[in-house]
Amino acid sequence: MSAHPIDEECEDADEESEEMDQRLYRTHPLTHTPQANHCTFFYAPTKGLHGHFSNFSRSDVDTYQFTIQGLEDIAGGHWEKPPKEYSYSSAEQAIMHRKAILMGDYVTAKYIMQTSNPGKAKKFGRQVKGFDQDVWTDHAPLVAYAVLHAKFSQNPKMKKALLGTRNSILAEASPRDRIWGIGLSAAEAKRGVAWRGRNLLGRTLMRVRTNLAR
């Protein structure tokens, strides 16, 4: 059976991610490998029970949108002023859009907002002019947290699903992404293979979950 187009976009983006964000990889320690029965694995939007945890999950599939205003409070003077409010159809679109604004590339930011395809948003994000890896390394985790908090706090079904994972360790089972994912498939992780990735997406989701549970 052929892969779903959205899943293929997700896999292609993973391959680029590890190549482009090596400094982000080096600045976050590799965590120990937890027992698989303590984990909730997710990956592509159409695979498994928790595909909506993927940044490629989008509104035309899961029927959600979320808005973000500002973010200048977490990114110093780099954000547009006065802050504007934007509605996003996927977390990937939101992160890439904020990345473009952070670098002052409003042309690419506009292109990102014109597509509902998270794979295309990711590709536009790779073309941001004036990109500064050091600035992005410092801000990417903050941007990801703000985006994911908005996504899950503004959508009751999403929030319920996230809180429903209780205290389990959330892990993006991406075989090719050793930064935002664990660098393994769920099947490999369940066989006890040591994680190769930093799992920044899973760790960020757990921070959001803790905040929303209060």
Residue ranges and their predicted role:
Residues S2-R214:
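Charged, low-complexity intrinsically disordered segments
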